[in-house]
Amino acid sequence: MMNVYITKAAKFLPNDPVGNDEMEQYLGMIDGRPSKARRIVLRSNGIRQRYYALNRQGEVTHTNVQMAALAIRGLLDEHLQLDDIDLLACGTASPEQLVPSHGVMVHGELGGQRNMEVVSFAGSCCTGGDALKYASMNVRLGYAKNAVASASERISAWMRASYFQQESEQLAQLEQHPMLAFQKEFLRWMLSDGAYALLLQGSPGESGVSLRIEWIDITSFANTTETCMYAGAEKDSQGHLHGWASFPEQEWLTQSLFAVKQDTRLLSEHIIGLGIDYLLELSAKYHFSSDDVDWFLPHLSSMFFKDKILEESRRRGFFIPEERWFVNLPLVGNIASASGFAMIEELMYSGRLEKGQKILMMIPESARFSYCYCMMTVC
């Protein structure tokens, strides 16, 4: 089998960054009143700015599809034209239609003269990793001479005030128990829009940094866990999920069915422990230790989890010190499926990488507890 390399990365982040005090100018106010919980949640998640495909009037400036296409076009140059691309793999947690798939909509937006293989991955944060794995396997097996993996989100569409019913904000409980903030309010002040694209080829780029993909492993713990994060559905007292089509149309808004929701009890109970369980399994499978990792790229939904990961990984015997971490969440926000690509893109062009260094990327997905790990070598 061939080696496969990430030879180029590109991004599209819409409009100007939005600071913490500007958010409700874009998203609107629930019940016409400023959120009293916003500052508490932001203090916990550590995000200082994010990007929205919205203007201050709440009007959409870019679609998910348009942003993905713009990021992909950022890969093109004199060495790669649109019609040179063999395969397109797209991941998103926020598709804008049920049918056609997000991927073929991106292909249609790109245009060009040549047909190509296109695949889409639906779900949540791991869909970017899914797209990267599918693209890398096709290049590695010789089915494609190159491939593009994209990950993009327009989650601001789900964060607007019109998607939320009036709900009380239990400020005292939020202060005393930060985990309670990981509900609708937390997610509303965390998520960000944007798109990233990676070019994969069978040999390193002629100049600059390339990253050889050593392996990508993905797993799901849905067989033993309940749904934790969901949208377009409601969860009953027995832990069963009921999709939007099970409800009368008049309840879609009154029950905030299309707001992104999180079961904070399950998140606290499982998200870190299961991720480390899987990491230890992979360290045995691929024969590596924490000492072999020069750069650790963890997709964090919130900086709230940083110290908890450090503490638990030390206790479990796979400790990567913070000075070897690379995280850009505070400046780009949580872009869900694109967050892993965002770290790769920024680190790739940072001037900080040295040949031979090992990069371990971790993407946890709380929806029903899936995890993606990817090991890369700097070339």
Model-predicted regions and their roles:
Residues 1-61, 177-269, 364, 374-379:
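Condensing-enzyme catalytic core mediating Claisen C-C bond formation in acyl metabolism
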Residues 7, 91, 122, 147-153, ...:
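Short beta-strand segments
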Residues 18, 99-101, 132-133, 158-163, ...:
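Short acidic, glycine/serine/threonine-rich loops at helix termini
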Residues 65, 69, 94-96, 108, ...:
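Claisen-condensing/thiolase-fold acyl-transfer catalytic domains that form or cleave C-C bonds
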Residues 83-91, 290-299:
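Short glycine-rich phosphate-binding loop at a beta-alpha junction
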Residues 143-165, 221-229, 303:
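Acyl-CoA/ACP chain-elongation machinery
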Residues 156-182:
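Short, flexible helix-coil linker/hinge segments at the edges of structured domains or between repeats
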